[in-house]
């Protein structure tokens, strides 16, 4: 009788294992992070295969099908997200706009991180007057009204794509310089850097093979957190007509273009606006999650 009772009590125990594993999984990977990763992967897939996924060329016009509403608003599957006043397919333009905006944001963020990290490491290595100059440049950059300067530069020199990417790359480099300088100074005071230096290793090897790999996780987290800001900056400048110029297209370009048809054809700017919001939100969620897991200063 005792064995029967013991067996009855012990029967539910196997169910606790899978439930606890699921709880641990969602604790390590929250649903919001999984959704953010899924959206980012979808955007990267679209950017890589926009030529294959787009049913039309983003410059193809059809004046007989101008301002066609999307499927949910009385349109047909010929234009899933509708068309603009020149008959261009909004869905096709959206796919190529995602590619363009992500490329600009990626190279702009990478350029800013490269400039800032290089200056930060130089300040940490040479110290003294070099550090003073770098800190002065950091304060100067942080105090500049970047948007006004960007408007002036693009209006004066024209809106070439290369100049636009370089200009975005010079935005926000000071945050990487501060991080790289502080972490490099801390790393130089630790035993492994001093030991390599005493063995006669050159400075480029010390920083390239020992210091930089140890501070890379924090820099990557900072890049992830800055990426949404770069997307919004590109979208804002393109919205004002100073970013990506026709016939090229970007998310901000589409929003600025659809502004003129907000009353008659709101779908022109609705789709790129939703993509901008969801993309920046997803990358921000992923960046916060990476910061909690990778940033050693939070442990």
PLM regions with names:
Residues 1-38, 285-299:
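Transmembrane alpha-helical segments of polytopic membrane transport and secretion proteins
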Residues 8-10, 14, 51, 65-66, ...:
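Generic N-terminal simple sequence motifs
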Residues 14-16, 20, 57, 71-72, ...:
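Intrinsically disordered, low-complexity segments enriched in proline/serine/threonine
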Residues 31, 86-299:
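Alpha-helical transmembrane segments of integral membrane proteins
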Residues 38, 46-83, 242-248:
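Hydrophobic alpha-helical transmembrane segments of membrane transport/permease proteins
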């Amino acid at each position: 009788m005792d064995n029967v009772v013991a067996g009855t009590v012990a029967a539910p125990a196997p169910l606790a294992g899978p439930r606890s594993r699921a709880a641990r999984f969602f604790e390590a990977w929250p649903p919001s992070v999984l959704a953010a990763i899924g959206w980012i992967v979808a955007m990267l897939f679209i950017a890589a295969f926009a030529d294959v996924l787009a049913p039309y060329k983003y410059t193809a016009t059809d004046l007989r099908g101008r301002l066609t509403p999307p499927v949910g608003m009385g349109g047909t599957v010929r234009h899933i997200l509708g068309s603009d006043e020149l008959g261009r397919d909004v869905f096709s333009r959206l796919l190529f706009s995602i590619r363009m905006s992500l490329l600009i944001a990626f190279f702009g963020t990478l350029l800013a991180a490269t400039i800032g990290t290089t200056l930060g490491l130089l300040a940490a290595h040479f110290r003294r007057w070099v550090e003073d100059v770098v800190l002065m440049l950091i304060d100067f950059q942080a105090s500049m009204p970047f948007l006004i300067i960007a408007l002036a530069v693009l209006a004066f020199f024209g809106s070439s794509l290369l100049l636009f990417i370089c200009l975005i790359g010079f935005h926000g480099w000071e945050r990487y310089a501060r991080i790289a300088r502080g972490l490099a100074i801390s790393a130089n005071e630790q035993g492994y850097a001093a030991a390599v230096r005493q063995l006669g290793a050159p400075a480029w090897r010390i920083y390239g093979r020992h210091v930089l790999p140890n501070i890379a996780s924090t820099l990557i987290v900072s890049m992830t957190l800055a990426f949404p800001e770069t997307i919004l900056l590109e979208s804002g400048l393109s919205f004002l007509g100073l970013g990506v110029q026709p016939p090229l297209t970007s998310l901000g370009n589409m929003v600025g273009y659809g502004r003129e048809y907000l009353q008659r054809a709101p779908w022109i700017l609705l789709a790129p606006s939703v993509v901008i919001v969801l993309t920046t939100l997803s990358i921000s969620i992923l960046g916060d999650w990476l910061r909690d897991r990778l940033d050693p200063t939070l442990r």
